[in-house]
Amino acid sequence: MSRTSWSAAAAVALLPLLAACVPNDPAGGAASSDAAGALTVSSTADACEVSADSAPSGTLTFSVTNDGSDVTEFYLLADDGLRIVSEIENIGPGISRDLVVQAAPGDYYTACKPGMVGDGIRAAFTVTDSGQDVGPTGDTADQLAAAETSYVAYVKDQVGSLIAGTQEFADAYAAGDDARARELYAATRVHWERVEPVAESFGDLDPALDLREADLEDGQAWTGWHLIEKDLWQPAPDANGGETYVPLTAEERAAAADDLVANTQRLVDQVTADGFTFEAFQIANGAKGLLDEVATGKVTGEEEIWSHTDLWDFQANVDGARVAYEVLQDVVAEQDPDLAADLDQRFVDLEALLAAQGSVEGGFGPYTDLTDAQVTELAAAVDALSEPLSRLTSTVTGA
């Protein structure tokens, strides 16, 4: 696969295709060139050159050198491009570090992210079958601790992409480039929708960023995405309570854009602060919460009432729920293999229906273009997933 721009969105998941991540060598000595599974990586501002595009399963060592002028990161991603198998952060210019992982056969991606925020550079990578056993290790407590670390990495990556996209969106909107702002709106919001349960844990951040007009209380100031959404897709009087919509002034636009960026930065600051954690029960509850978001807001078409970009949010909520489940999947499979099998299939079924409508990368049509039968089918698939997902928390906590 040719190298392409990539917006990383991922969790350091405990996957069936991953046995364990060996701690990174902080000194960064390179692996011997004739060792099995030894690869070199050169990261620059516009390239991520890996010495091979495949390796045998087992222990892999990526010796990563930053040949660019900015701090970089290196990732090994799972086959969906949304889950980080393992990563190295904060590789300074001229520095080399090793990423050592144990990987089972399968399709992966390698990725460098110069600057550590926003887009990155990826390439397909294949792990062939060496015949070596690669399986889960550690007791349940260790697996849950690793899952929590995994999910925090996923959240940090998502909010990094979110702040970069939000800044670009806000700049376009404040400058009056409505066409560009509309183009960026849904694609940027997916990073928010994937990790919204984390924002909700910080109290006032969720309403500051994602409050719908229909949920405003008397005297409450309206800020965030949906204020700007309405201004970009201005409603006719019959869709605005019979009143003619009054567009925001240039000054009001600038204030709304600045507020959106500032509140998003607050989220970034919270999740990148020392000591930020998200426990296993919160991850599991968050997976169910994201499906509830779909059932109450996306299936009904009420979330994006002006732009009708609900399918983007729908997909992002499902992405977030799936990643939350998958970081816990090994524990679920051990505790209740039937539940794990059921969840695996229900996610496949729902995502197949969404794939028929488009993708985050390629875009979706307006939610209002769906037929009643299609909406009903999506709602049924959400319900079918929601029931087994409601048992996730009790399964991983042993309640």
Model segments located where?
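C-terminal motif of bacterial Sec signal peptides marking the signal peptidase cleavage site
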Residues: 16-20
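Beta-strand cores of secreted/periplasmic/IMS beta-sandwich domains, seen most often
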Residues: 51-70, 97-112
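Surface-exposed loop/edge segments in extracytoplasmic proteins
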Residues: 81-88
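Extracellular/periplasmic metallocenter environments
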Residues: 25, 40, 92-134
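Beta-strand signatures of extracellular beta-sandwich domains
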Residues: 73-77
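Bacterial N-terminal signal peptides that target proteins for export
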Residues: 1-10
